[in-house]
């Protein structure tokens, strides 16, 4: 049973603060082991990948090959469900259409002194996409990472995916193909991250790595950061639903369980101004748990990390929503637009009673790679902007240099950097 927090209780602030700091992941001390893996991949290249893949995934890359071939991809189309392929293509088109609107524009202008300033955007040359294997192997996540990269203009999009027993989910391969992935390798874990960062005989290095993974993958991304860029360190999924008593309790329960079924560490939270409705949702959750194939996982998530928060008014929920800063926020209330206008922190917001978060996971068009663990307070979801970089531009002529030079020389002198001042003065015979 999820916990219940009542804003009217005297100890609410203390309990709510404790709730915000609840740790949902068991931290494994894997840094030392990951450091060894990275060092070995840097030293031994493909040989290390082959050995680690045999050890961890029971797959023989000597016979299978490290790279996934065109024939492998063609075979994936033959074995994948045609309806699922059609749905992936539908989702791909919507994701592409939305992300094309995110392309930033270059700018050049001349200020009052005649100085030209501006910036230009260029795509990152090569990006690596990590895709988890096994039960966490989601074709939709391939689309969400690869499509924005291609829209941004990234020429080389490299996917690494573990192949337990030599098998890769065929829909993952189809998703990679239809979204423009240019290379696919059947390696996973920290050794795959090392290969993307430093390269091997088969895998050329990339400039940035995106995509979720387990504790080893997360540690590897942290350790290679600086050599390459990374997107984020993603934690367990989470949803916060703000709902009044006008909602269908079964709908809201289904939304809460849609997150809870992801992982035992996922978190589902309901904030309501109607205690009776909150109880009805809890009862609906218990009923629906009995019918879910992943009911055991969802039940553990709801029991350990779920919450129902009772507030006096929907307006009183606003500061709590901003403090929680959830990955997903559903606003199933009458004035969802007005509430949104006063909100600050959320990875993504789903407005109204007919916008379940699951639509955003698949076919809404917006990206489902979002900040978790309250990091929406300072970061954003994945977008085209994650795959481009901005270069500033400055242009002066002799007249503009004469105008700006005195202040530049004075600042260089104040900072004790004489060569800086000289590089300006020498052009003006000063």
UniProtKB/Swiss-Prot annotation:
The keyword Hydrolase does not apply. It comes from the Bacteria. Pathway: Amino-acid biosynthesis; L-histidine biosynthesis; L-histidine from 5-phospho-alpha-D-ribose 1-diphosphate: step 9/9. CDD domains: Histidinol_dh. Binds 1 zinc ion per subunit. One of its GO terms (biological process) is L-histidine biosynthetic process. One of its GO terms (molecular function) is zinc ion binding. Keywords: Amino-acid biosynthesis, Histidine biosynthesis, Metal-binding, NAD, Oxidoreductase, Zinc. Its cofactor is Zn(2+). The active site is at residues 327-328. Belongs to the histidinol dehydrogenase family. Catalyzes the sequential NAD-dependent oxidations of L-histidinol to L-histidinaldehyde and then to L-histidine. This is Histidinol dehydrogenase. The lineage of its organism: Bacteria, Pseudomonadati, Pseudomonadota, Alphaproteobacteria, Hyphomicrobiales. The gene is hisD.
